Amino acid sequence: MGILGDGVAVVQNLVPTGLITAASKLAEAPLGLAEVATRLVEALAINSITEKARRGRRVIVKRRNLHSEQLADLTNLYFHMAEIPIRFWSKVEEWQRWEVGCFEMLNGDRYRAYASGTRCVIAEKLPGESLWEHLNRGTLTRRMLQAAAAEFRRAHQFWSDHFQGRWSHGDGSSQNVIYDSSNNRARLIDFEIVHEKSLATSARQADDLLVFLLDMVGTVPNRQWLPFSTTFLEAYGDREVIAKLRKQLDLPGGLAWIWWGVRTNFTNPAKVKQRLANLSRAIAKLKSYKEAGSALARNKRRPSISCQTIKPGIPTASSRARAIKESAVAGPSRMLRSLPTKT
């Protein structure tokens, strides 16, 4: 049974009345619901997040709130109706596996995460601050953007059995990029949202870049917009993904614009449109966009030790073991190309 129509009764006692009204109206009048749908998106508090000390180390505790599955399903309904190809992990167990697996894949060289009980994920706190904090303080620099781009590029090299392709974040906002100035290193966090499997790899990864850029589009001064955005893309450097990003810079209409409004902090649409148009022209002049060099390499599989799914979101080491076995048969030259690198 769906959430709309008779399905409203399923969540009627679990979420605020205003959200039920919003869900019903989304089906009845999908045009002109900016205010209602915005409240729908913003009101869904799926997690509570606290910082604690455990065994002398600071950790971040993410706890799924009561009725979070129903709230996530309601948000996913909006994404589906607006044709936005992302979704929340609504099942708590699947979210825990994915959150822990992705954190360990990207940050497990120095930091740990684990599921705790039936509703929590605990992760060691990463050093540094989010780039969103730097954006709002006006302390964002090109050096930080280059570090963020390098981390996105590194993360996008990992193989995911869930996608049967290279990994993508799903919510690549600046809030989810932690920058440590002591070693000029950026790291990714927060894996609540996942792209739809139907998206091509380059489209998923381009969406990660787009979400990051949309944070800046309404925040940085006009004189910094193009220098900052092109610095980020040049440092990322993957021609195929950047070409796909350029095709995603047109403003959407209907319900999808509401999500863009959230992403851009409800910046004036005319301002967003102008800045993205300027970026599109600038991309055409980028060296990394003009020169083909990475497309062939991106088609080669580089297995990782995490985010390999035998059920939705379950990491396993089978991909790495399989690749090592195949490489041994193929000879040393193939082994050097196949094994993933870690930083």
Q: Which residue stretches match the model-derived regions?
A:
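Activation segment
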Residues: 66-67, 128, 180, 186, ...
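A glycine-centered beta->alpha junction motif in the catalytic cores
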Residues: 66-67, 71, 75-85, 108, ...
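C-lobe/activation-segment region of protein kinase-like
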Residues: 191-289
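Juxta-kinase regulatory segment immediately upstream of eukaryotic protein kinase catalytic domains
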Residues: 2-41
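Conserved kinase catalytic-core helix
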Residues: 97-110, 132-170, 175, 180
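ATP-binding glycine-rich loop module of kinase domains
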Residues: 47-94
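Low-acidity, Ser/Thr- and Arg-rich intrinsically disordered low-complexity segments
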Residues: 294, 298-327, 332-343
